[in-house]
Amino acid sequence: MSDLTALPADFTWGVATAAYQIEGAVAEDGRSPSIWDTFSHTPGKVDGGDTGDIACDHYHRVPEDIGLIRQLGADAYRFSVAWPRVVPGGDGPVNKAGLDFYDRLVDGLLEAGVTPFATLYHWDLPQVLQDRGGWTVRETSEHFAAYASQVVERLGDRVKDWATLNEPLCSAWIGHLEGRMAPGLTDLTAAVRASYHLHLGHGLAVQAIRAASSDARVGIVNNLSPIEPASTSEADLAAARRADGHINRWWLDPILGRGYPQDMVEEYGVDLPVRQGDLETIAAPLDWLGLNYYFRQIVTADPDGTAPHARQVSVPGARLTHMDWEVHAEGLEQLLLRLTEEYGVGRIYVTENGSAYEDVVAADGSVHDPERVRYLEEHLAACARAVGKGAPLAGYFAWSLMDNFEWAYGYDKRFGLVHVDYATQRRTVKSSGLRYAELVREHAGRREGRTAA
């Protein structure tokens, strides 16, 4: 059994999702297309030709899904607000019907005793803004801040915990450099400019959120990976340093007041469109930092590739998930301690952590996923070890509440604690979901014991 006794008494136990991955209803109640609607409907971009048109049909099943959150024992739910549902024009007036949906969701969560954690951007940029340059232009940063203000003005009396962006690395590097995610570009200059305007949009949104809600608690969510060299050669050591810059430092340093890493500015060779005051805006003080963790990266030099000229290599004999990602819980502990010791972060949430496996529904209707149970236990134990060494970890959000549209992988990759039969929309709590609820109960029992003592 995992030793989780080091987790604080007020530890937040959550589950997480994202709008495009679960909502469906892409053309209902005034929602406009997002870049992911465009991307997923482009032949060859998503495995199986899958789209988010229906997904988990969460838009029509909110009460049922809130019930599942409670069944899993979670006391917090991290969801994202769909920008094209709330401001279909990208900028300008609010679509009342779109914002009403999140109003009902928040009220339902609070009635069920679940704390809402809202993410304002989880990759679904309105296509109308992409048509005008998307994140490669400064105006999108400004429109994002205006949209953030509109959402917080409506929900901020009940939602106190806000994330500006989810995994901006994926939006910039995978969406604009590697082309494997929307908008599907392969342009280093566009990618670097997008990274900058995502950061600027974050900083402007922090200002907008605080102006709209004086007691808001604001953070950002970054996906990070420990980086290790494949060998002790000078080339691999240098490649690991560049990969760390590309994956970690580029996304942490500016928002935490250190500016952009000069070695990576030189590596990319792209002029950043910095205006006076921008770096201060980007480094607006935060109340918490969100960490999404899935795997470490072991890299070797790749001089013929694109920036950062480092290529990930496989680990012989490693345990792998259905994503072919190595299971390495120690990496989560390493990152939590790095954020604490190197960056001085004062409050951290693990905002995503989870695994995909080839789940099978048994004859009796149950779904047994022992690999995911083990994964959960190992990563929560890593969290507890980090807390024991001083990490200010305030909570953990399992990815994901339920199986959903896994971006370019379509519906083949299942991350949920709850199984979804996409043909019928039937939800079934997996063994991992039952175990998660058990871990929450055990922690609550320890908390009551500490209080009684």
Regions found by a protein language model. Give the residues of each.
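Active-site region of glycoside hydrolase catalytic domains
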Residues: 2-46, 70, 89-91, 99-453
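Catalytic domains of carbohydrate-active enzymes, especially glycoside hydrolases
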Residues: 61-82, 284, 288
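Glycine-rich, proline-tolerant flexible connector loops at the mouths of alpha/beta enzymes
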Residues: 81-94
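A common structural microfeature
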Residues: 10-12, 59, 76
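Internal amphipathic alpha-helical repeat/solenoid segments
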Residues: 58-65, 88, 98
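Active-site mouth loops of central-metabolism enzymes
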Residues: 47-61, 138
